[in-house]
Design a protein with these regions (language model features):
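Exported/periplasmic ABC-transporter solute-binding proteins
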Residues: 6, 23-78, 82-274
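Bacterial N-terminal signal peptides that target proteins for export
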Residues: 1-10
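C-terminal motif of bacterial Sec signal peptides marking the signal peptidase cleavage site
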Residues: 18-22
């Protein structure tokens, strides 16, 4: 569940389209400035970690732009940002571009429905069949006689990539009837407002306003993600080039991986790498 700090940041993201302390471009002339861009799932907790790091390191400025995993990785490759945030594994060509990856957290992806939906569990195969258009009515999976409104993330989203990889289908197989939206917050809002909708969001965004379905009878929680019994999970990564990142940028990564930093990760609804 989102805590108050992440919820506040999420509202800002929805209203502004991105959340940034500054302008979000790399500036090698200022060794105390850390520029970060990428995943909208990773961004809110990195903002909070950044605030804590700034408070401990006078003069340090951390800029965060939430622009999607693929865009953030591109920025890390071309040096626009010191660090790219990704909510998916790096692709072979991204690794070949010289990026070093650091896993900072683990995230389960929740399959969500409206609070009034009587379906509480789906098999992984049923989720796949819904998203590929083979199952189109809730009565086919034990629900009411109503059409399923499929909601998915935009192309380039790390959450979408992680979801599709774990569920087992490619982008071209996604049903043509799917509604496409950006950001876990927007997906959650759509599902809240439509009794027949199904969507998927980052674990940290789940709250009492939606149903997080069990998958093959397994609940989404930290223990089940860590022991691999919950089927839909992905890493939160930082990606950087060694010749671009500053010493303070490296120090920030060390802070996130410390016990204090990982406690912040867990306090905000995500799963520690420790």
């Amino acid at each position: 569940m989102l805590n108050k700090r992440v919820a506040t940041l999420l509202i800002g993201t929805i209203l502004m389209g991105s959340l940034a302390v500054g302008c979000g471009s790399s500036d090698s002339s200022n060794s105390n400035k850390i520029t970060i861009s990428g995943s909208t799932s990773v961004g809110p907790v990195v903002e909070i970690l950044g605030e804590d790091f700034e408070a401990k390191n006078e003069g340090v400025s951390i800029e965060v732009q939430q622009i999607g995993s693929s865009a953030g990785i591109k920025n890390a490759i071309d040096g626009t940002s010191q660090i790219g945030m990704a909510s998916r594994d790096l692709k072979d060509e991204e690794k070949a571009a010289g990026l070093k990856e650091t896993q900072i957290a683990i995230d389960g992806i929740a399959v969500i429905t409206n609070k009034n939906n009587i379906v509480k569990d789906l098999t992984l195969e049923q989720v796949k069949d819904i998203y590929t258009g083979k199952i189109t009515n809730w009565k086919e999976v034990g629900g009411n006689d109503a059409p399923i409104v499929v909601v998915s993330r935009e192309d380039g989203s790390g959450t979408r990539d992680g979801f599709q990889e774990n569920v087992g289908f490619e982008s071209e197989e996604l049903t043509k009837d799917a509604q496409i939206s950006d950001g876990s917050g927007n997906i959650k809002s759509i599902v809240e407002g439509n009794e027949n909708a199904i969507g998927y969001i980052s674990f940290g965004y789940v709250d009492e306003n939606v149903n997080a379905l069990t998958i093959d009878g397994v609940e989404l929680n930290a223990e089940n993600v860590k022991n691999d019994s919950y089927a839909i999970a992905r890493p939160f990564l930082f990606a950087n080039k060694e010749d671009v990142i500053t010493e303070q940028g490296k120090n920030f990564i060390d802070f996130i991986l410390s016990e204090e930093g990982q406690n912040v990760v867990e306090e905000n609804g995500f799963i520690s790498v420790n």
